[in-house]
């Protein structure tokens, strides 16, 4: 006898998902950037974030820009963003970027990240990309380990993001990549 299985899935995000994505993103960022970025440098206005998400989902910036959501019992528990890779050393026809892969901190370890990652790879593969890149915080060993287990590796690219435009709040990132198809 088996127990009941959770109702879990991944689908393309709808504009109506904006409030849930915004709330999840801001909560996840507080955890992800703790000790890396001063708390007051992070956005806190969920309504403003929801409005920005709604606009983005209603009118994506380009045809191959996708937002996917992981659901558990029709509740958003994670999201991923895919798009052509914007880096100057990437080929926007062949290289996709996984711009964000975020799972609700309270829902980690339940397979949502793996489902999102697979759906994101399937999506960019359907868009005929042959490689995917992702920028990770250099100290985010959890994400880097998760991606390494899935076959991703650093490609030697690195950068520092200036989050507040003053040069005070810099976040070091490394780029990971994987070949697909």
Per-region residue spans from a language model:
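Acetyl-CoA-dependent GNAT
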Residues: 3, 12-16, 23-106, 114-119, ...
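Extreme N-terminal starter segment of soluble prokaryotic enzymes
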Residues: 7-9
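Amphipathic alpha-helical recognition patches that constitute DNA-binding helices
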Residues: 20, 97, 131, 142, ...
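Active-site acidic-Proline motif in GNAT/NAT acetyltransferases
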Residues: 104-106, 110, 138-139
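Conserved short alpha-helix immediately C-terminal to the canonical SAM/SAH-binding motif I
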Residues: 116, 140-143
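Conserved GNAT acetyl-CoA-binding A-motif
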Residues: 124-136
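Conserved catalytic-core motifs of GNAT/GCN5-like acyltransferases
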Residues: 133-136, 144, 148-172
